[in-house]
A protein has these predicted regions:
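Mobile genetic element proteins and their domesticated derivatives, centered on retroelements
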Residues: 7, 13, 33, 47-50, ...
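Acidic/histidine-rich, metal-coordinating catalytic segments
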Residues: 43-55
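RNase H-like two-metal-ion nuclease catalytic core shared by retroviral integrases
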Residues: 75-98
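C-terminal domain-tail junction helix/linker
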Residues: 102-163
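Short hydrophobic/aromatic-enriched beta-strand-loop microsegments
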Residues: 66-77
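A short acidic (Asp/Glu
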Residues: 55-61
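Active-site beta-loop-alpha junctions of metal-dependent nucleic acid enzymes
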Residues: 18-41
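Short, flexible loop/turn motifs enriched in small residues
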Residues: 1-3, 14
Length: 163
């Protein structure tokens, strides 16, 4: 069974990056944190994870030098009560699992299913916790038109591929 690790912005619920691994608690997910930092263009102020050791190890590898200068907090002992929890991430994991079950799992690391789910989650799906707005809309990225999928496809087809 393959495991999906993902990064999500807490305020906007924007799915930033993902990594597929063969193991759940021992995979090196440092590349995930580094990719998230590159995509966001900056290091986060707080990283909220569960208590798995590989999250702490990856946090140290990806942010340790910056941690001293930028005071990045790593909260890894989350609880369901209170304002420090990872329920938003767990909800997204459930959303992914529901879809993955139907197609019988993620077979490859570069599965197009994951990119499609990421696009749907960020640009098409309205979120109840965001008052019906999309994650992209909350982040200030607007997709105009009635059919957001069609708009995204049309815009993608206009883009020139990178060499």
């Amino acid at each position: 069974m393959r495991c999906l690790y993902a990064l999500m912005d807490d305020q906007t619920r924007f799915w930033i990056a993902q990594q597929v691994a063969d193991t759940k608690y021992t995979a090196d997910i440092t590349p995930l944190f580094q990719e998230g930092k590159q995509i966001a263009g900056k290091a986060p102020s707080t990283v909220i994870t569960d208590g798995a050791y590989n999250f702490n190890s990856a946090f140290r590898h990806a942010f340790w030098r910056e941690n001293k200068a930028l005071a990045i907090r790593h909260e890894r002992h989350v609880r369901f009560q209170g304002d420090l929890n990872n329920q938003k991430m767990e909800r997204m994991n459930g959303e992914i699992r529901d879809r993955e079950k139907i197609i019988r799992g993620v077979k490859r690391e570069d599965s197009p299913l994951l990119k499609g789910l990421q696009i749907y989650h960020n640009y098409v799906r309205p979120h109840m916790g965001l008052n019906g707005e999309t994650a992209a809309g909350k982040a200030g990225i607007r997709v105009e038109g009635k059919d957001k999928w069609l708009t995204i496809i049309q815009n993608a087809s206009k883009q020139k591929p990178k060499d």
